[in-house]
A protein has these predicted regions:
Chain A
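Non-catalytic connector elements of ABC transporters
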Residues: 27, 250, 261-384
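The feature captures the beta-strand-to-loop junction immediately N-terminal to the Walker
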Residues: 48-50
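Conserved ABC transporter NBD signature motif
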Residues: 71-79
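ABC ATPase nucleotide-binding domains
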Residues: 89-91, 95, 99-242
């Protein structure tokens, strides 16, 4: 298990954007630290990281708003050093939009065309088309200050798209919107970028947003790239405890691997992975924490997917002390729409999270026994 | 910070010039480049003339005579002048703030009929020549003045006359500088503070006051500078007992022809002003706060409740007593003829009968407007460039530049005017016979106003808006044109108004350099006042009234010009 600091997905001479050991320092501290990254034409790459991980600075360096202290930014194969922002041909959608308050919607969207000297008529047409595309037909004459957050977002997007940038960058594109709107917009954005063939580099701290939007996800930590891969890759195989925890996985413990058995605070856990013996980090996805048996007297739903494990039936018949698995008290339950997240306090080891279906969820305070599904475990590098 | 990074792989093929490969890139050179114009302007039209006249005083025969400095400084009389200059300026500033801040609040936050008129009215005194103000106050509180007639009350030759006249003068500085920003602060900020548990005053103190502080400090500094260098008011109202440095410099230069002493005093005033600017820079500390400015039209509302109406009434009353009364007396005097009231003095202005002028005094109106217009253009250009540079740059160089631009405000106009005469008379800078000389001198006084008005607003423009423009393809110049300019258009109009007004009223320097056949209004008024006789006095009052009306008309017109899209500002 090695940390994949893949410089880029192979040799891509046609990469639209290419960062080579890009470094930006603020006050001597590297905010972006030797980052290598390539974005192919038509690809959507999402940089994911907690606030302060340097992702916004990365965008600013590409846009030419922050000067690199080392490394190179190449756009379409050309080094951008010394090229001012307005000649880079990249679009940037700011986190808080930064619409021009003194201009109306049409003047905002048409700004990039106007400064390029596009004629009034053509400009009007393209603005109308863009507004149509972002779902704001006929909003040309409206004041941007009178728009709702979602509408401002759409105007900002249309404005960034208008000059036809070779690379569109989005800084927390949906950060300030409420959830329903965000989920709808993310789908719209993705299909829009597909349709237009836009090359997109987005940064966000929201994994849901990143996974929904991106062809490829880049997880950043303290200015460095921690992991790169497709959303499915990153989600199913986080390469470090940091990435795992950042993705919301909390069932991570240090363990010692012998063969396919990891010895950890929760006891011996079977893993599906093959790895050299020795110290490792162990992640168990919440879905892999299987509930066996609530206390007698509680309804034990035999139909529940989580209890329908081989051995589950046997467990119920045996005495409690003799039961295999880890005994846990249900500390709390969080409803997540179609499933429930259980917060468990095990008899040994740190707290656990488990998911189960709504109907199968045991009550708070109930005592359950859990087992770990080897297929839902991930081995991580040992934690320092 | 390294210029070039140790990049593995092939070096960039066509690298740009090394100069652009620095950390901050070309932006680093923007501020210095913008500063070039203003610096040259100030070097030629301020530094050079002032240096020339000071050198003439200290090096009369090509030899430095620095011993004189000690003599002057040891002089008990000079020390008294220095002390009086300082404390009356402090007292005037405090009194002006005390009386004008309620006015600034009322004009910023309340909507009431005649508001625009009120704003113009309080600005009129500021642009009146000091001699006229002196005369107006004499007519009010001097011997045979209105108060003397009514209650036998005389305040001339007391320090109160000086302080009141200074408040009269500078009321507008506070109202315009502080109130202008105040009216664009979002009232909801204060409302938010109220909801968080702050009292009305507490909310103001914690939310509004900090936002206003830079403007407040700027206003206080301006008032202090003006009153520190006060000339006409002190000379006319103070009598022989009171003299500021400026009055003393004038006396030494024009009356005693003691250029060495005048030179020492000029340097002394310089040092004092520089110290003030230093203190100012230290206290304000140039925090670049990106204020959320909103449209001024959206922040005012009719006064609510007895307290607010009382406040409005109090402000109106104080403006009536402080501003309208002296102006009213001025008008009354202009209409008073030996046998009652009439327009005889005004009619006389259109003729050359009195023999004081080679042209009818009324022509001075045209001269003044033309010269002030040119001076305004110069001031806007120089001041606008300087403000743009100050917005972009930081650091010692820029702060020094900022202070330098304020110096003309603190420099004796007499020194500048006389310096123009003796310095700009040899080729290639032989401007003595050029009509440009007067506008140039007046622009010098206008530039600091332009900068002071523009700077807070320019600084409040969010830099990310410029960055957004840049990523959309706008060059820095274009971004300035598209982003900054529309946002500061209102401030620009305001700055133009200020520059125009101070140019119209400028006297101390203009009197030295205006051509006899092209007098400006203040010069013509002073010439009339200098002549004995009721008729000349009446005509001076009449011409002052004309100047006042011209100023009022200009200011009212400026009040009407609002940016087309101000609703979105």
């Amino acid at each position: 298990m090695t940390k994949t600091t893949v410089p880029s997905s192979g040799p891509v001479p046609g990469a639209m954007l290419r960062l080579e050991a890009l470094t930006v320092r603020y006050g001597g501290r590297p905010v972006v630290d030797a980052v290598d990254l390539a974005v192919d034409a038509g690809e959507t790459v999402c940089v994911l990281g907690p606030s302060g991980s340097g992702k916004s600075t990365l965008l600013r360096a590409v846009a030419g708003l922050a000067a690199p202290d080392g490394g190179r930014v190449l756009l379409g194969g050309r080094d951008q050093e010394g090229i001012p922002p307005h000649r880079r041909g990249v679009g940037l959608m700011f986190q808080d939009h930064q619409l021009f308050p003194q201009h109306d919607v049409a003047a905002n969207v048409g700004f990039g065309l106007r400064v390029r000297g596009t004629g009034r008529e053509e400009r009007g047409e393209r603005v109308a088309r863009l507004l149509d595309m972002v779902g704001l037909v006929g909003a040309e004459r409206r004041a941007v200050t009178a728009l709702s957050g979602g509408e401002q977002q759409r105007v900002a997007l249309a404005r960034a798209l208008a000059p036809g940038p070779r690379l569109l960058m989005l800084d927390e594109p949906l950060g300030q919107l409420d959830r329903g709107l965000r989920e709808r917009l993310v789908v719209e954005l993705r299909s829009l970028f597909r349709r237009l063939g836009t090359t997109v580099l987005a940064v966000t701290h929201d994994q849901g947003e990143a996974f929904a939007l991106a062809d490829r996800v880049v997880v950043m930590r303290d200015g460095r790239v921690e992991q790169t891969g497709s959303p499915v890759d990153v989600w199913s195989r986080p390469v470090s405890e940091f990435v795992a925890r950042f993705l919301g996985f909390s069932n991570v413990v240090p363990a010692t691997l012998t063969g396919t058995t990891a010895q950890c605070a929760w006891g011996a856990v079977e893993v599906a992975e093959d790895a050299p013996d020795g110290p490792v980090g162990l992640l168990v996805r919440p879905g892999g924490v299987r509930l066996s048996e609530p206390l007698a007297g509680h309804d034990a739903p035999a139909s529940g997917e989580h209890t329908a494990q081989p051995g589950g039936a046997a467990d119920t018949t045996a005495g409690r002390d003799a039961l295999p698995g880890l005994g846990c008290v249900v500390k709390g339950r969080t409803f997540r729409g179609d499933h429930v997240v259980l917060h468990l306090d095990p008899e040994r080891g740190p707290d656990l999270e488990a998911t189960c279906s709504l109907r199968a969820a045991p009550a708070e305070g109930a005592v359950v026994r859990v087992r770990f599904d080897p297929e839902e475990t991930v081995l991580l590098p040992p934690t320092g | 910070m390294t210029d070039t990074a140790p990049v593995p792989g092939p070096p960039p093929p066509t690298g740009p010039a090394p100069a652009t490969r620095t950390r901050t890139g070309p932006r680093r050179f923007v501020a210095p480049a913008l500063m070039v114009g203003p610096v040259v302007f100030f070097a030629v039209f301020f530094g050079y003339p002032v240096t020339a006249i000071v050198a003439r005083g200290l090096r009369p025969d090509g030899e430095w005579e620095l011993g004189h400095v000690g003599e002057v400084l040891a002089d008990e009389g000079i020390r008294q002048v220095l002390w009086f200059t300082t404390w009356q300026a402090a007292a005037s500033t405090a009194l002006t703030l005390l009386l004008a801040l309620p006015g600034a609040y009322v004009l910023a936050r309340f909507r009431f009929p005649g508001k625009r008129l009120l704003r113009a009215v309080v600005t009129v005194p500021f642009v009146l020549p000091t001699v006229v103000v002196g005369a107006a106050f004499l007519g009010l509180i001097g011997r045979g003045g209105l108060l003397d007639d009514l209650w036998g009350l005389r305040l001339d030759t007391t320090v109160w006359a000086i302080l009141l006249a200074h408040v009269f003068f500078n009321y507008a500085v506070v109202v315009r500088t502080v109130g202008g920003l105040w009216s664009q602060l979002d009232p909801r900020q204060e409302e938010a503070a109220r909801l968080l548990g702050a009292g009305a005053f507490g909310a103001w103190r914690r939310v509004t006051l900090p936002a206003l502080l830079p403007a407040l400090a700027a206003a206080a500094l301006m008032v202090f500078l003006f009153t520190f260098t006060s000339f006409g008011v002190v000379q006319i109202l103070g009598g022989p007992g009171y003299a500021t440095l400026e009055v003393e410099i004038y006396r030494q230069t024009a009356q005693l022809l003691d250029l060495p002493t005048a030179a020492v005093l000029t340097l002394l005033q310089f040092a004092a002003v520089a110290a003030m600017l230093g203190v100012h820079g230290w206290t304000v500390h140039r925090r670049e706060s990106a204020l959320r400015l909103v449209d001024a039209a959206a922040t005012d509302r009719p006064p609510r409740g007895a307290g607010e109406r009382l406040l409005l009434g109090g402000v109106l009353l104080s403006v009536a007593a402080l501003v309208l009364l002296p102006l009213g007396v001025l008008i009354e005097r202009s209409l008073r003829v030996p046998d009652g009231y009439g327009f005889a003095h005004y009619r006389a202005l259109a003729t050359t009968d009195t023999g004081t002028f080679v042209v009818p005094p009324l022509e001075a109106v045209g001269n003044s407007l033309r010269i002030a217009a040119v001076a305004t253009l110069i001031a806007l250009l120089v001041g606008g460039l300087a403000a743009a540079a100050l917005t972009r740059g930081a650091g010692r160089l820029v702060r020094g530049f900022d202070a330098m631009l304020m110096l003309p405000l603190g420099t004796s106009a007499v020194t500048v005017g006389f310096g123009f005469l003796i310095a700009l008379d040899t080729p290639p800078l032989d401007l003595r016979s050029s009509w440009l000389l007067v506008p140039l001198a007046q622009a010098l006084v206008g530039v600091p106003f332009v900068i002071r008005v523009m700077l807070p607003v320019l600084r409040a423009v969010d830099d990310r808006l410029r960055q957004a423009a840049a990523t959309l393809g706008a060059s820095p110049l274009r971004a300035w044109w598209e982003v900054d300019l529309p946002l500061v258009r209102r401030a620009l109009v305001l700055a133009a108004g200020f520059a125009f007004a101070v140019s119209l009223g400028e006297f101390g320097a203009t009197v030295f350099i205006a051509r006899p056949d092209e007098p400006t209004l203040p010069v013509a008024i002073a010439r009339l006042l200098g002549r004995a006789g009721e008729a000349n006095y009446g005509q001076a009052m009449a011409l002052s009234t004309v100047l006042m009306l011209v100023c009022a008309a200009t200011l009212l017109a400026l009040e009407r010009i609002r940016p087309a899209r101000s609703g979105e500002f």
